């Protein structure tokens, strides 16, 4: 296609002027001087990494994780921190709920000695700390736990019973406008944990909503809905949760996929159990009766023993993990557990926020 040389000269002149005024990189062609692949951090769950499409949570973006109480929201974010720290990244945890347990975090593999932690007094303080950490360019992952606990200063200084309609939503809206651009420039991943509330008077559709207004729903590149679907028992003792995560919004890959995995109390995500299940499903691990074998060698009788073998032999576990990632990320449809959620297809979906109505 022939381009008018006068237009080319005019474009070159204006681009030069913009770069001189606002700095190099302030405007560029989409495919120029940058990797088209999105840098990601693992969630700690292979099936969830595959459901996300890109292999994990995207850097330089805002992510929202929401769900009912005790569904595994904080555990999932601590797994992300542990994965980031293993890659040498710097992480910060804004504990607005004042409920972070350092002993539990350490059990999940978090290096608590190098984890930055803040327990802010007000919502504005929490978001200002986020903004300062982001602009520094020195922090790679920031977790905010949770949006519901980000209380505006006016509400804290007021009396119980005072009306403060829309204060939190206005605060979050302003923060999103400030943070979004800075996060992209510093390539920082910002994860907001959120709680669920019920809309009053909803007769049809989903009555659930999240706190903090609508701004976060629009600015988030990824929104994850995490739910506890059952209990894991050893005899009569409950030792963990069966967990399902739905990707209700995804701007970096196809949305509406889901992943199922186990969260064990005091241990976090059951990675080796996932490897055994996915390995068998994709014929990397052979199953004959109750026995599991890998490359002709028996690795255990029963799923628990096979998982224990992989825990004791991390090199073999890493080899299986690498092979599965290459297989599933190149062909995500091969994984049945991360198929599109049938429930979402039954209702109307807001493609901007991922909400079903």
UniProtKB/Swiss-Prot annotation:
Keywords: ATP-binding, Cytoplasm, DNA damage, DNA recombination, DNA repair, DNA-binding, Nucleotide-binding, SOS response. GO terms for biological process: DNA recombination; DNA repair; SOS response. It is found in: Cytoplasm. Residues 332-357 are annotated as: Disordered. PROSITE patterns: RECA_1, RECA_2, RECA_3. SMART domains: AAA. GO terms for molecular function: ATP binding; ATP hydrolysis activity; ATP-dependent DNA damage sensor activity; damaged DNA binding; single-stranded DNA binding. ATP binds at residues 67-74. PANTHER family: MITOCHONDRIAL DNA REPAIR PROTEIN RECA HOMOLOG-RELATED, RECA. This is Protein RecA. The lineage of its organism: Bacteria, Pseudomonadati, Pseudomonadota, Gammaproteobacteria, Alteromonadales.
